[in-house]
Amino acid sequence: TLGMTGLAQAAGDAAAGQGKVAVCGACHGADGNSMAPTFPKLAGQGERYLLKQLNDIKSGARAVVPMTGMLTGMSDQDLQDIAAYFASQNMSVGAADPALVARGEALFRGGKLDQGMPACTGCHSPTGSGNDAAGFPQLGGQHGDYVALQLTNFREGVRTNDGDTKIMRAIAEKLSNKDIAALSSYIQGLH
């Protein structure tokens, strides 16, 4: 069926997906828990969000240089199965830099209302678990380096697959480098 955004709703088979993720494991880990801080953890991420990212990467709507050509030849069902597999896994937890926790938590929970920046909790939940029905990703436990890179990419207009509302670009424009460092560290330790 088609959802509000016109994307087909994920109808993946996690068991089938397990057999299709071997190549993914080199960067993202066999269970979706990347050991490299610049590659995102996919484990436990919402199926809808994962499927959107896979489709955007495959179509070129989201440029991810290390994934160039990796999804070529994969069917819609393959992508749905891969998304279902990673969504069914448990994300490993990380730790925040204690020196950055207070600032990161203040941004995550309170935003910068004086600058029109809402709290992250509104879309990504107070625990960072996201909202898969709305397509908002889980952030809690994600690698801080990866989160920092994505926030920077949104801020600089390098990443633009946040929809017509440009919500993440508008939010990231209000973040300084110090804000991004604190927020991404806090998110890494959030679970």
Each language-model region and where it sits:
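The canonical Cys-X-X-Cys-His
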Residues: 24-30, 82, 117-126, 183
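Detector for the c-type heme attachment site
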Residues: 26-34, 87-88, 123-129, 188
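Electrostatic cytochrome c docking/interface patches
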Residues: 4-21, 35-38, 88-114
